[in-house]
């Protein structure tokens, strides 16, 4: 899901148990999935606020961390937010504390969750609507959107014609993998080892997009087994493809796809983008391995699981409410009501060697994480920074000195590709294959769906303890027998 950290946050290491024993209502703890935040931004936040930063591997660990009062602020997926709401563990978001306007051209203040919708892309507005039986049916009342993502299929090498058609489904993808199995044999196909994510995908495949709901309808183990076996019924088995590489560490998955050691994989779109940029191995790849527009392809099926992660505040830590809102602003909302010109400003006076050192926290985080920002100013398909319809080169050049522009001529594939992605200066240095890749990346940042499907059908909701147990058992059994 995330990239390896490039910077060290702590000068010494302590055991997790000793960290936890020192945490609680007297210590502000910011918690997140590993490598799901810009290290430079985290350093800035730590300079302003004394806090402990911890990571967790799953939403279930996050929920436990809130229940035992360890975490003050954390990132949670939608279904985890729903569960935390039901367990009365969240403090409502006071949107007035952020001192935001509804847009850069508006003087109207954002005072509540309803006002806040104006800051976000359209998909967020629908996803934020919770089920009718929840305590409050507006997700934005309890949480601040952090990043949005959906599942895509990545493959290396020549294009597969069946996957270049419009309205490709996940069933089409699985059939294409099986048809072209010689490309993916010998452990060259990779899946994320996450029971819930793969179930969501399998459920869409199982219904052949007819119901297109990623959430389970039953709780028996036979039901979950049958859904997982939808892959087997289409021929996606280790007996047919020799073996399938399944790994829970998305960093490994990203780098395997970036290097070409794996020829295909099902990953989140942000991870696909980072792999397209070379992943953590970009400085080590040979010319033949480096992804470009001819050998790296991202397929976005028309109906695909969607994940929205949000920042939440622990209700039990009432003494940290002011700090919690300030930190959430720094991580996710700083720049949300600004113009694009303001959003892409950098601070050269700080003397950093990192070219992606943005003044606004939301832009700094986006430039590192590479997932879809929920903010309209960044991700709106017509007016956002990541848009093929606008050119930001002129606004960027106005902010740069002659010396800076000269120094940026020094070519680096990774930064040049990111510049082209954001339509900054010097994108002409990219060759045609690299420009094709940039267009592929831009498309990956646009998450769309079939008009007949509601966003909430594609977002995971809470499941019962029995469903969770049977889902996990069925997944383990399926992997053992078929993958």
Swiss-Prot record:
InterPro entries: Uncharacterised_lipoprot_MG045 (IPR000044). Residues 1-22 form the signal peptide. GO terms for cellular component: plasma membrane. It is found in: Cell membrane. Keywords: Cell membrane, Lipoprotein, Membrane, Palmitate, Signal. A lipid is attached at residue 23 (S-diacylglycerol cysteine). It is a lipid-anchor. Its main location: membrane. PROSITE patterns: PROKAR_LIPOPROTEIN. A lipid is attached at residue 23 (N-palmitoyl cysteine). This is Uncharacterized lipoprotein MG045. The lineage of its organism: Bacteria, Bacillati, Mycoplasmatota, Mycoplasmoidales, Mycoplasmoidaceae.
